[in-house]
Amino acid sequence: MASAFSPATAAPAASPALFSASTSRPLSLTAAAAAVSARIPSRRGFRRGRFTVCNVAAPSATQQEAKAAGAKESQRPVYPFAAIVGQDEMKLCLLLNVIDPKIGGVMIMGDRGTGKSTTVRSLVDLLPDIRVVVGDPFNSDPDDPEVMGPEVRERVLEGEKLPVVTAKITMVDLPLGATEDRVCGTIDIEKALTDGVKAFEPGLLAKANRGILYVDEVNLLDDHLVDVLLDSAASGWNTVEREGISISHPARFILIGSGNPEEGELRPQLLDRFGMHAQVGTVRDAELRVKIVEERARFDRDPKAFRESYLEEQDKLQQQISSARSNLGAVQIDHDLRVKISKVCAELNVDGLRGDIVTNRAAKALAALKGRDTVTVEDIATVIPNCLRHRLRKDPLESIDSGLLVVEKFYEVFT
């Protein structure tokens, strides 16, 4: 049976009821895990049994071992994010998604050789640390049952004390040739039938949970895989169904896609699922081009020394992101501004409400990045073209609107 990835069938409610109805007090972690387990979908006719994860790496015994493993994986030097020259629109969209993952990811379209992949991969150094359960392939959060893997949730229900380690948010690359089983994970049908055990080998979606999933040349990816990725990103859950056996696990990640419009566009209904859209152009200023070439030459000669020269700027930016993530919940946006955002969307004939929601979230994230607790008109003006330009109705033969129409409508409504 083919994989079914549908928010209606694969995902539990987005906001868990983690409070006792009788006392209005927070539930214990064990009770919360039980509440989440009760909401995970099960279908009549699907087999039930124990859940095991196979073919995963052995857990690190200590935090030092985990750090050593992470250092080994990152031996290839990464170009510093702070050293990227220009491309401010793309960099801002990436930072806002790191601050608020619920924005829904970003689609980056631009000419070849403009630094799309380099910029996305340079984001790794700025990602904050998170607490994860040692040895868990789903990067389970030990404090939040909503993002726990099934095996960890069972351990919590049994009262086991979970070993925890601090690790960097991961970035997972999805290759163009990946199969659906590699992306979603596979079930060992033979073991399930003979031993009554749901033997599940996690895929890339499991590895990307609580992290970033990057798809280069996403416009060349098979449409059914794009559907799978977007549905999982929207629902936060991945469900694998094979031969009457169903397994669900959390898959909350920031989806970042990039591509060259000359090689083809994504379908409009798929574009709409990306929270933001960034356009990247070739730098035309001769001085900037020379600076980019020189900086790249410095990096190629001595990557370590080049990275150290930007260490202070990188640390400052990382602290700014961490502070913005912490203060995001305190940021407010006036009702009048929310009404005007919706008016812009309505007058541009934007289908659905995703444009309204994403614009509100992106404006709040930008205010938090700037260290403020109130959204201004300037914040909205900065993000609204990236939130709406790819949602406008257009002639199939035209390229994506450059954002000028959005900007014109914005100033018409806000002035």
Swiss-Prot record:
Sorted alphabetically, which keywords does the UniProt record give? ATP-binding, Chlorophyll biosynthesis, Chloroplast, Disulfide bond, Ligase, Nucleotide-binding, Photosynthesis, Plastid, Transit peptide
Q: What GO biological process terms are annotated to this protein in UniProt?
A: chlorophyll biosynthetic process; photosynthesis
Location (main, coarse): plastid
Q: Disulfide pairs?
A: C93-C184, C345-C387
Q: Does the keyword Chloroplast apply?
A: yes
Pathway noted in the entry? Porphyrin-containing compound metabolism; chlorophyll biosynthesis
Q: Where is the transit peptide?
A: 1-67
One GO location term (cellular component): chloroplast stroma
The catalytic activity, as recorded, is: protoporphyrin IX + Mg(2+) + ATP + H2O = Mg-protoporphyrin IX + ADP + phosphate + 3 H(+)
Q: How is its activity regulated?
A: Redox regulation; active in reducing conditions, inactive in oxidizing conditions. Thioredoxins f and m mediate the reversible reductive activation of oxidized CHLI.
Protein EC: 6.6.1.1
Q: Which GO terms describe its molecular function?
A: ATP binding; ATP hydrolysis activity; magnesium chelatase activity
Q: According to its UniProt record, where is this protein located?
A: Plastid, Chloroplast
Enzyme class at the top of the EC tree: ligase
User: Origin, by domain of life?
Assistant: Eukaryota
What biological function has been recorded for the protein in this entry? Involved in chlorophyll biosynthesis. Catalyzes the insertion of magnesium ion into protoporphyrin IX to yield Mg-protoporphyrin IX. The reaction takes place in two steps, with an ATP-dependent activation followed by an ATP-dependent chelation step.
Under the subunit heading, UniProt states:
The magnesium chelatase complex is a heterotrimer consisting of subunits CHLI, CHLD and CHLH.
Q: Which family, according to UniProt?
A: Belongs to the Mg-chelatase subunits D/I family.
Q: What is this protein called?
A: Magnesium-chelatase subunit ChlI, chloroplastic
